[in-house]
Structure formats: C-alpha cells, structure tokens
Amino acid sequence: MNILILDTSSNEKITVGLVINGKKDIRVEKIISNKTQIILPLIDKLLKKHSLKPYDLSEIQINPGPGSFTGLRIGLAIANAMSFALKIPINEENGKIILPIYS
C-alpha cells in the first residue's frame, strides 16, 4: 500500500510524504514562493526517489485543517484532481474518507 501524504495547512511550510508498506518518508519544504509552484515538483521528486509512478499510489491522505484557507484549498484541489485521475480515495489523517471515491 502506497499512500501520499499532503499537508498544506501552514503558511510557512508544505509537508509531502509517502507511506510505503508502513514506512514513512516525509519532506517538509519552507515556503519561499507560491505553494502551487512547490507542491507538484515536491510530489514528483518524492515519487521518483522511490521509483514510483502516480498510478502506484493507493490512497491520498490529507490534513483537512484547521489552517490557512488558501493553503487548504490548494492541497485539496491537488488531492481531488489526483484522486479523480487515479481513481483512489482521499482520507484525512485518521483514515476517515473526506471526499468520494471516483469510479
């Protein structure tokens, strides 16, 4: 099971991680510019580090808040787009499904 972790709730940092067979690899990036310019390359870099493709993901886990409204929207929009394209669920940190599973 390969889980992508996204946390865009902070105004100061973005957290992107992978859980691969129970082992976590978390990257925290300070926000220097726009979150949208940082998050997608960060996801790509982390997937490549583990020789994974987006289609290898089985779930997306996201921090639904509280936090920066715009930051949360960015994270949820990216998670929603990936969920739709990859047909995988989006869950919050405790495993509760927060968006529908696309079929």
Task: Describe each model-derived feature in a short phrase.
Residues M1-D44, K48-Y55, A85-S103:
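Oxyanion-binding and handling regions
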Residues S33, S68-F69:
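A generic secondary-structure micro-motif detector
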